[in-house]
Regions:
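Extended polysaccharide-engagement surfaces of secreted carbohydrate-active enzymes
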Residues: 2-335
């Protein structure tokens, strides 16, 4: 954070006539920088905290898009022939294979907002279930990188990336194919897209196809660490606070909430599994087991799916009025 402040203190780049750059200094103050000298300088220059960024931001050198409104942010991540899907090292991120398989974590809870307050905590995190991603749910010894050192796996398909509409809304599109590597499923493929409009995101998947008969293929809606086992999930209008919880639902239309105020509508799914439970997973550096309580929901495509797909919408922190309307009717149309 302080880097914003140091750059701002070098001088004004905007032509404002101030002794420090107001945009960089405003970003530093918004992010609550802690350098006392910088804070004093910016106050003397009459600079206050800048506005929170809002819009859809494209980062195709990372095959990524960031969708922001208010105090929440969603990072959409893919990979392609030029952008690797994750950075795995000897003692870092050993189970991070799925980070770019169409992931879409929502960061928007806490005061201040943080990843931890938004439910993203490593202790007990199931590395197979990255929100938004379509993955094969593997045992951890098989999910761990097959190489003892660095692995930066690329996607053999070039068509993956993000685009924006007038900087306000946008899309992520991804076609991925798994490489032929130890403990991978060669040729496993999926076509995925995410359309972002204000606080709505529409997730579409098709051509989900692989020959892995041993383990199920899944698309994760959410995985969130719970501060209390009594945190509630709403499923088709019914509240569930029991712990542990294990539900399976399907049908033409399924409406559910997560534990952070976000709302999901899943269309024509054979099976959506919803759990609240204690989970144990290995640390990404040491492999030591760690435990935590998590609420999770995922679409189960079964083993060795052939041309499977999905359609679901996510409404980020909707009002009660919005929820009432969405339960009855979609706010979008798939052409």
């Amino acid at each position: 954070v302080n880097a914003f402040g140091y750059l701002a203190a070098l001088g004004d780049l905007t032509g404002s006539g101030k002794g420090a750059d107001p945009e960089l200094a405003g970003a530093y103050l918004r992010l609550k920088g802690t350098d006392k000298e910088l804070n004093s300088l910016f106050r003397k220059e009459g600079i206050s905290a800048g506005p929170t960024p809002s819009g859809f931001f494209v980062y195709n050198y990372g095959a990524a898009g960031i969708h922001r409104r208010g105090d929440w942010m969603v990072t959409l991540k893919a990979f392609n022939t030029d952008v690797w899907g994750s950075e795995i090292y000897t003692k870092d991120n050993r189970y991070g294979r799925y980070q770019s398989y169409g992931s879409a974590p929502i960061i928007g809870s806490g005061n201040p907002v943080s990843a931890a307050a938004s439910g993203f905590v490593q202790e007990g995190w199931d590395w197979n279930r990255v929100p938004g991603a379509t993955t094969i749910h593997l045992p951890y010894p098989e999910l761990e990188s097959p190489l003892p050192g660095t692995l930066m796996e690329r996607n053999p398909e070039r068509f993956s990336g993000a685009s924006s509409l007038e900087g306000r809304n946008g899309i992520l599109a991804l076609h991925f194919v798994e490489k032929d590597r130890k403990n991978f499923t060669p040729g496993a493929t999926a076509y995925k897209s995410v359309f972002c409009f204000d606080n709505r995101m529409v997730f579409l998947g098709s051509g989900i196809d692989n020959d892995n008969q041993a383990y199920p293929t899944e698309t994760t809606l959410f995985q969130l660490r719970m501060d209390s086992p009594a945190e509630q999930i709403e499923v088709d209008g019914e509240l569930y606070d029991a712990f542990p919880l294990n539900l399976s639902r399907g049908g033409e239309r399924l409406a559910l909430s997560d534990t952070k105020g976000n709302f999901y509508v899943v269309k024509n799914a054979a099976a959506v599994n919803i759990t609240k439970k204690e989970q144990t997973s290995p640390n990404d550096k040491t492999r030591a087991p760690q435990t935590g309580n998590f609420a999770t929901a995922w679409i189960d495509h079964g083993r060795a799916p052939k041309q499977a797909g999905y359609e679901y919408a996510v409404y980020i922190q909707p009002t009660n009025k919005e929820i009432t309307r969405l339960i009855k009717k979609d706010g979008y149309e798939v052409l």
